[in-house]
């Protein structure tokens, strides 16, 4: 399983809006993607730091996942104070 982890920076006062956009726009879009297996958004409203984690059942469709990422970032680009940092990891253990 592949995990896409995105480190986000926003203004602390925009945390609730980021959560709204992620919940109402990003997650429904993700559910339409092939091999999507879950999404989590972690936030620190005091600092404006956010971490998005999405899980994918396979790496076969990496190009599609990259396209999804670009579309996802567009949904909340106006809230960002820095360019998001994206990394991919292999998910080795689920407990």
Protein language model regions, located:
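Short S/T/G/P-rich N-terminal loop/turn motif that feeds into the first structured element of a domain
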Residues: 1-51, 55-70, 78-95
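Glycine/threonine-rich phosphate-binding loop and adjacent beta-strand/alpha-helix elements that clamp
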Residues: 73
């Amino acid at each position: 399983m592949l995990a896409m982890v995105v480190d986000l920076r926003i203004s602390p006062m925009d945390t609730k809006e980021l959560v709204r956009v992620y919940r109402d726009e990003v997650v429904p879009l993700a559910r339409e993607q092939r091999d999507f297996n879950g999404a989590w958004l972690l936030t620190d409203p005091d600092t404006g730091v956010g971490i998005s984690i999405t899980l994918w059942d396979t790496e076969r469709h990496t190009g599609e996942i990259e396209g999804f990422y670009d579309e996802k970032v567009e949904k909340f680009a106006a809230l960002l104070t820095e360019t998001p940092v994206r990394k991919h990891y292999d998910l080795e253990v689920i407990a």
